[in-house]
């Protein structure tokens, strides 16, 4: 089939690679002059299936209210004039019940665990250079209350068979020796050895090069105008004077998919959740994490690359505003300076922001749309890279009419009625 993929982030490029591998003729359209230049560009650098869980969880509405009053809050809301923001938040809070959380968590873990398997197969097949490490994630607890609360997370991990290690402060230093330099700040941790790290930008560029070898055509600086319908079916994409005919179209436009598809009568429950990161040159290899650590208090991840440190996190509901908020810089700088004060040169930090495409229930949208011939692969939230390989393989199988390795139940737009 002739297939057009819209969007050159990690989800779009991964979709294109799997579709080309299945034998399809694939064209990828991207408005920027290269791949992974927006949300996939400078994320936290984690592939974390062990942390595949919806933000919509019991107790979150109360926590969110408290966070709004904190100086270094992990979550903030900047009200906009768009009524969709409020509707999306109400849908999210409606998913904060124990029953909804359990259902959504199960769907996300199913896809994330499958994606980890797909990622391993992909990594074994292709010699991709993306500064990847397979050394796990260490979640750090600064208080006994956080450590005690992790027992609920451990129960969920055991339920889904996710390997873990519950560690005291000494155990955390054994996994991440640099933490010994700030002894007394951490009371314990939860390690997920199956998680991975790396530079998502480098990964996406490397995979795009492999996709080109399979015949994928990349069209950059391409401003997509609309999807053309014939007898109710998606048959082409128009971009200026260009027309790209297609047997199938994959929308992997992240947060921008919602507005783009609205003229077709498709109501996507995907809203941008703004995240921030700092990238620092490493100054002392013994004073930084070996892999990635997640500060539970501030919801900030610190990830080691070859010669750099990536500090990422935060969640800001402010629409499509891409302005860099200096308060977020202060929080990220505070966390990395507090835990790894001698590891990087903060004076040379690169400050970045991106818009994560989030659904109210946390589960992405992977599968058919209400318009025949148009397929969705968006809404992955903070787990875009974590779920990219599994989502790409699943979508390729669905489009190809092949049997799928996992069920797509609850992963499509159909769950929203």
Curated annotation (Swiss-Prot):
<comment type="pathway">
    <text>Amino-acid degradation; D-alanine degradation; NH(3) and pyruvate from D-alanine: step 1/1.</text>
</comment>
<dbReference type="InterPro" id="IPR006076">
    <property type="entry name" value="FAD-dep_OxRdtase"/>
</dbReference>
<dbReference type="GO" id="GO:0055130">
    <property type="term" value="P:D-alanine catabolic process"/>
</dbReference>
<comment type="similarity">
    <text>Belongs to the DadA oxidoreductase family.</text>
</comment>
<keyword id="KW-0560">Oxidoreductase</keyword>
<feature type="binding site">
    <location>
        <begin position="3"/>
        <end position="17"/>
    </location>
    <ligand>
        <name>FAD</name>
    </ligand>
</feature>
<comment type="function">
    <text>Oxidative deamination of D-amino acids.</text>
</comment>
<dbReference type="GO" id="GO:0005886">
    <property type="term" value="C:plasma membrane"/>
</dbReference>
<dbReference type="InterPro" id="IPR023080">
    <property type="entry name" value="DadA"/>
</dbReference>
<protein>
    <recommendedName>
        <fullName>D-amino acid dehydrogenase</fullName>
        <ecNumber>1.4.99.-</ecNumber>
    </recommendedName>
</protein>
<dbReference type="GO" id="GO:0008718">
    <property type="term" value="F:D-amino-acid dehydrogenase activity"/>
</dbReference>
<keyword id="KW-0285">Flavoprotein</keyword>
<keyword id="KW-0274">FAD</keyword>
<dbReference type="GO" id="GO:0005737">
    <property type="term" value="C:cytoplasm"/>
</dbReference>
<dbReference type="Pfam" id="PF01266">
    <property type="entry name" value="DAO"/>
</dbReference>
<dbReference type="InterPro" id="IPR036188">
    <property type="entry name" value="FAD/NAD-bd_sf"/>
</dbReference>
């Amino acid at each position: 089939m002739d297939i057009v993929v819209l969007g050159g982030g990690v989800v779009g490029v991964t979709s294109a690679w799997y579709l080309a591998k299945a034998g399809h003729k694939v064209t990828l359209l991207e408005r920027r002059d290269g791949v992974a230049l927006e949300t996939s560009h400078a994320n936290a650098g984690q592939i974390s299936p062990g942390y595949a869980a919806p933000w919509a969880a019991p107790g979150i509405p109360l926590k969110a209210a408290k966070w709004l009053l904190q100086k270094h809050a992990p979550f903030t809301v900047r009200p906009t004039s768009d009524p969709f923001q409020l509707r999306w938040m109400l849908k999210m809070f409606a998913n904060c019940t124990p029953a909804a959380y359990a259902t959504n968590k199960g769907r996300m873990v199913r896809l994330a665990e499958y994606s980890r398997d797909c990622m391993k197969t992909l990594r074994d097949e292709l010699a991709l250079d993306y500064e990847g490490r397979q050394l796990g994630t260490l979640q750090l607890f600064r208080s006994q209350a956080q450590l005690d609360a992790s027992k609920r997370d451990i129960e969920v991990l055991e339920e889904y068979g996710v390997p873990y290690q519950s560690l005291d402060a000494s155990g955390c230093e054994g996994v991440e020796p640099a933490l010994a330099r700030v002894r007394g700040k951490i009371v314990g941790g939860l390690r997920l050895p199956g998680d991975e790290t790396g530079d998502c930008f480098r990964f996406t560029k490397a995979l795009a090069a492999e996709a080109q070898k399979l015949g994928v055509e990349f069209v950059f600086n391409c401003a997509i105008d609309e999807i053309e319908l014939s007898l109710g079916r998606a048959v082409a994409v128009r971009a200026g004077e260009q027309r790209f005919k297609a047997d199938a179209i994959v929308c992997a436009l992240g947060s921008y998919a919602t507005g783009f598809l609205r003229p077709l009568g498709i109501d996507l429950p995907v809203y941008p959740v703004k995240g921030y990161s700092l990238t620092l040159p490493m100054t002392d290899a013994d004073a930084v994490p070996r892999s990635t650590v997640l500060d539970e208090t501030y919801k900030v991840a610190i990830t080691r690359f070859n010669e750099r440190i990536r500090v990422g996190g935060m969640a800001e509901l402010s629409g499509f505003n891409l302005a860099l908020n200096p308060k977020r810089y202060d929080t990220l700088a505070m966390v990395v300076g507090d835990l790894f004060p001698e590891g990087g040169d903060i004076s040379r930090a690169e400050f970045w922001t991106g818009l994560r495409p989030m659904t109210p229930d946390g589960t992405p949208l992977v599968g058919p749309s209400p318009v025949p011939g148009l397929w969705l692969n968006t809404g992955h939230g903070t787990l875009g890279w974590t779920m990219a390989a599994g989502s790409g393989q699943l979508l390729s199988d669905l489009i190809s009419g092949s049997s799928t390795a996992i069920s797509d139940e609850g992963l499509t737009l159909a769950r929203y009625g």
